[in-house]
UniProtKB/Swiss-Prot annotation:
Composition skew (Pro residues), residue ranges: 1-12
Gene Ontology biological process: carbohydrate transport; lipid transport; positive regulation of platelet aggregation; sphingosine-1-phosphate receptor signaling pathway
Species annotation: Mus musculus
Consequence the record notes for mutating K413A: Decreased sphingosine-1-phosphate transport
Keywords, in A-Z order: Cell membrane, Lipid transport, Membrane, Transmembrane, Transmembrane helix, Transport
Name of protein: Sphingosine-1-phosphate transporter MFSD2B
Tissue specificity as recorded in UniProt: Widely expressed with highest expression in spleen, lung and testis. Predominantly expressed in erythroid lineages giving rise to erythrocytes and platelets, but absent in lymphoid lineages.
Gene name for this UniProt entry: Mfsd2b
Null allele phenotype: Mice were born with normal gross appearance and thrived. An accumulation of sphingosine-1-phosphate in red blood cells is observed, while sphingosine-1-phosphate level in plasma is significantly reduced. Mice display hemolysis associated with red blood cell stomatocytes, and the hemolytic phenotype is severely increased with signs of membrane fragility under stress erythropoiesis. Mice significantly reduced thrombus formation.
Residue span of region Disordered: 1-26, 473-494
Length: 494
């Protein structure tokens, strides 16, 4: 589940300007190229999916660092990813073209570094006093490096071919592969570490409040991290072998658009964009809170720890399978009508907090996946309409589409950072004990609030803002065909 990237992602779009619909034969991409391009985005989704569901549980129960330090690690990591977005676009835009292109060296160069950062994020160091600093540093590094990969990788779509149709096809391959990576990440990681958090974990310990960490548990997490990290060199090799960046013959001309901060000042005054961004600040933060606390809730606030892996799998499978359905609903009934699909999870989340039983949990997992799918699909469907509306009212140079997308990602990442940081800090105030088998009643109540009331309130607030906000005007067909096609090149989720 993913996001756009890069304030001014290097040479994109204009180099190959071509009338829509003119699909020259020499602009076609082979199926092999599209598949290899799609595979290149898999590792980031695998890693993001695994960390979204299991990182908090690992930091509290295995690394056994205080909840306040977990809060700092999550907040710092998300903020570093948000800040890295415009920074990456700036440096990539300033870089020179090499023999392998301008974007490919950045994407391929980041991959081994991301793999190392990800592995050490799940490694249990021998010392205990500085573990909080260890995990904060590596999570910040992982998020920043992942962004430095994703910016050039998504921008690469625009200079693979001059054909808009082939660009759309390459983007479809990428998003399909990324959805598969999202599903694979949490599934593989969960299967490897499932025995570490079963109901038998505390049965043999004489100190159930805070059992020692078994070396086997630490080893399982290292194995899971190594498996995920290995996807980076494997997929990176296929990306390098199967995809060739085309020459950008007009990069200087394409770089004369708005810079990020000037463009942000202009776009932030556009009412439909403000409505969309503010509404999905709440909705995306609610989804991240729901994802992050489901595993903790099942482990410490209910007796569902043996069902965690199945519940995570159901959420992801239902999200992937329901995406085509939501695409049809968007076309058939309209985008604002489809937004009501997000609130389907609200009553079920409250039901799970009130009645934490296995049958209820499985139903909630399925419905949550369906709602998460539309919450991820809807903003990327509405943003192009907002961009079209803005371009009809203003005459701006190239780069404005990128500013819309990158600023949206920037703000949603910051909202996720704040939501996860504050919510995890609330566990500290409730008296959460790192590594404890049995948490205090205050912690159990807090987890129920975080899994039920908090996402519910945030989703309802976001939907109200979205539904009462201004609707962008739809351009005429002839005008729409002349608007930039660059907007379809970003996005991926976590």
């Amino acid at each position: 589940m993913s996001v756009p990237h890069g304030p001014t992602p290097a040479p994109v779009a204009e180099p190959h300007t071509q009338e829509p619909g003119s699909d020259k034969r020499d602009g076609r991409l082979s199926v092999c190229t599209k598949v290899c391009y799609g595979i290149g985005g898999v590792p980031n989704q695998v890693a993001s999916s695994a960390s979204a569901f299991y990182l908090q549980l690992f930091l509290l129960d295995v690394a056994q660092i205080p909840a306040a330090q977990v809060s700092l690690a999550l907040f710092g990591g998300k903020v570093s990813g948000a800040v890295a977005d415009p920074v990456a676009g700036f440096f990539i835009n300033k870089s020179r073209r090499t023999g392998s292109g301008r974007l490919m060296p950045w994407a391929l160069g980041c991959m081994p570094l991301i793999a190392l950062a990800y592995f050490f994020l799940w490694f249990l160091p021998p010392f205990t006093s500085l573990r909080g600093l260890w995990y904060t540093s590596f999570y910040c590094l992982f998020q920043a490096l992942a962004t430095f990969f994703q910016v050039p990788y998504t921008a690469l779509t625009m200079i693979l071919t001059p054909s808009p149709r082939e660009r759309d096809s390459a983007t479809a391959y990428r998003m399909t592969m990324e959805m598969a990576g999202t599903l694979m990440g949490a599934t593989v990681h969960g299967l490897i570490v499932s025995s570490a958090h079963g109901s038998q974990r505390c049965e043999d310990t004489v100190h159930p409040r805070s059992p020692a960490v078994s070396p086997d548990v630490a080893r399982l997490y290292c194995i899971a991290a190594a498996v995920v990290a290995l996807t980076y060199p494997v997929c990176g090799s296929l990306l390098c072998l199967g995809v060739k960046e085309q020459p950008d013959t007009s990069a200087p001309a394409s770089g004369q658009g708005l810079n990020f901060f000037t463009g942000l000042a202009i776009t932030s005054q556009h009412p439909p964009y403000l409505s969309l961004v503010v509404s999905f600040l709440f909705i995306s933060a609610a989804v991240q809170v729901e994802q992050s606390y489901l595993v903790l809730f099942c482990t410490h606030a209910s007796k569902l720890q043996d069902h965690v892996q199945n519940l995570v799998l159901i959420i992801l499978v239902s999200a992937v399978l329901s995406t085509p359905l939501w695409e049809w609903v968007l076309q058939r009934f309209g985008k604002k009508t489809s937004a009501f699909g997000i609130c389907v999870m609200v009553p079920f989340s409250i039901l799970l907090a009130a009645v934490p039983s296995a049958p209820v949990a499985y139903v909630v997992a399925f419905v949550s996946g369906v709602s998460i799918a539309v919450s991820l699909l809807l903003p990327w469907s509405m943003l192009p309409d907002v961009v079209d509306d803005f371009q009809l009212q203003h005459r701006c140079g190239p780069g404005v589409e990128t500013i819309f997308y990158s600023s949206y990602v920037f703000f949603t990442k910051l909202s996720g950072a704040g939501a996860l940081g504050i919510s995890t800090l609330s566990l500290e105030f409730a008296g959460c004990e790192a590594g404890a088998c049995q948490q205090a009643e205050e912690v159990v109540v807090t987890l129920k609030v975080l899994i039920g009331a908090v996402p519910t309130c945030m989703i309802l607030i976001g939907l109200c803002i979205l539904l009462v906000g201004p609707t962008p005007k739809m351009p005429r067909q002839d005008t729409s065909s002349q608007l930039s096609l660059r907007r379809r090149t970003s996005y991926s989720l976590a």
